[in-house]
Amino acid sequence: MNKSYPNHSLENFFSTNLSATDDAVFAGIQAEFTRQNEQIELIASENIVSKAVMQAQGTCLTNKYAEGYPGRRYYGGCEHVDTVEAIAIERAKKLFNCEYANVQPHSGAQANGAVKLALLQPGDTILGMSLDAGGHLTHGARPALSGKWFNAVQYGVDRETLEINYDDVRALALEHKPKMIIAGGSAIPRTIDFAKFREIADEVNAILMVDMAHIAGLIATGAHPSPLPHAHVVTTTTHKTLRGPRGGMILTNHEDIIKKINSAVFPGLQGGPLMHVIAAKAVAFGEALGPEFKTYIDSVINNAKVLAEVLQTRGCDIVTGGTDTHLMLVDLRPKGLKGNKAEEALERAGITCNKNGIPFDTEKPMITSGIRLGTPAGTSRGFGAEEFKLIGNWIGDVLDGLVNNPEGDAIVEKRVRKEVKELCSRFPLYQ
């Protein structure tokens, strides 16, 4: 026995790998790695992080409690995690050209909740985009806390263009006088006019909050206009197009607002921050500050346009007629299909996406009339325009098979799955 470990069990505790200690969990992780490696990921809110980001999350920082903020902690021994969090904050501020950042929210939903806790009172009126039009649960959807604790008024999209109608947003704001207006969402394929939202907010003396979770990577590189010159406060996730760990962040240029935000995040909503995740955020922000990240985002957008164009040639109806961003909504009604059945058929063929409501959808949320597709993950593993042309045609083949048979075309799905696996083998993950 090693003399440095009087208790023999400790020697194993600090040295034995997961594969030797927990077969069941290790097997689940390996199975998920195989799935990611052999399937094409088109879920718009997912991405593939670098090995460095993954390594940061698997460090000893997971052991450290650090309630409070750098230099003002409730626990001792925080000098090194203070350094890491300070790096994350400074990189976030540089990346988005803003004055203040809070990198502690565990998720985008937590970030949105913290903003409301900081700046609103229960019962206040908020104006956000409806879920079916492309908004998010946290923007006032009835089943969510934001729809229960606040008087949530929802704006949608124009019935003709299927884009935001700013005159309609203004009319709702003038009618309901919201305390907060929320811009952004989870399924908006077109550029958002943040300046117009600020004009409307100022007209009714409302706070403008922008949720840029889906387009943060695009904003960081200048591929989408930044909300920071216009919004009072901006929230985001740190995954999606930003290609970092799963987490949230809050940005602002207003000192009075960041003081309220910091108190709302801790102690208002959260306890100890996840320091290993904050370290990974810092790594991801550092990556996003490099020139390669702009090239990546440019490819994400170009690949999305290519995919949308191919799908249109295959008879698919793309909501708004195309995309300016990383995602698109496919309206399946012209093909007589439901989103849930399309999702299932595509997954059988090795292509992962999600069923999604479309504007003015009459189907239930677990059925839907559409699917949402995104290019961030595929682009991260190296897919370019030629690969996305293939992917678009594979999707077309699978959907056509579903049109001809409600259970799908097993022969087509098997053939596509084989071709998908062959393509993925040329672009392996984490070698």
Curated annotation (Swiss-Prot):
EC number: 2.1.2.1
Reactions performed catalytically: (6R)-5,10-methylene-5,6,7,8-tetrahydrofolate + glycine + H2O = (6S)-5,6,7,8-tetrahydrofolate + L-serine
GO MF annotations in UniProt: glycine hydroxymethyltransferase activity; pyridoxal phosphate binding
InterPro entries the UniProt entry points to: PyrdxlP-dep_Trfase, PyrdxlP-dep_Trfase_major, PyrdxlP-dep_Trfase_small, Ser_HO-MeTrfase, Ser_HO-MeTrfase-like, Ser_HO-MeTrfase_PLP_BS, SHMT-like_dom
Cellular localization per UniProt: Cytoplasm
Annotated site residue numbers, Plays an important role in substrate specificity: H239
Keywords: Amino-acid biosynthesis, Cytoplasm, One-carbon metabolism, Pyridoxal phosphate, Transferase
Cofactor needs: pyridoxal 5'-phosphate
GO cellular component, one term: cytosol
Pathway recorded for this protein: One-carbon metabolism; tetrahydrofolate interconversion; Amino-acid biosynthesis; glycine biosynthesis; glycine from L-serine: step 1/1
Broad class of where this protein is predominantly found: cytoplasm
Pfam families for this protein: SHMT (PF00464)
Record-listed (6S)-5,6,7,8-tetrahydrofolate binding positions: L131, G135, H136, L137
Family: Belongs to the SHMT family.
NCBIfam families the record matches: PRK00011.1
Subunit and partners: Homodimer.
Function in brief: Catalyzes the reversible interconversion of serine and glycine with tetrahydrofolate (THF) serving as the one-carbon carrier. This reaction serves as the major source of one-carbon groups required for the biosynthesis of purines, thymidylate, methionine, and other important biomolecules. Also exhibits THF-independent aldolase activity toward beta-hydroxyamino acids, producing glycine and aldehydes, via a retro-aldol mechanism.
Protein known as: Serine hydroxymethyltransferase 2
Organism: Vibrio parahaemolyticus serotype O3:K6 (strain RIMD 2210633)
Lineage: Bacteria, Pseudomonadati, Pseudomonadota, Gammaproteobacteria, Vibrionales
Gene responsible for this protein: glyA2
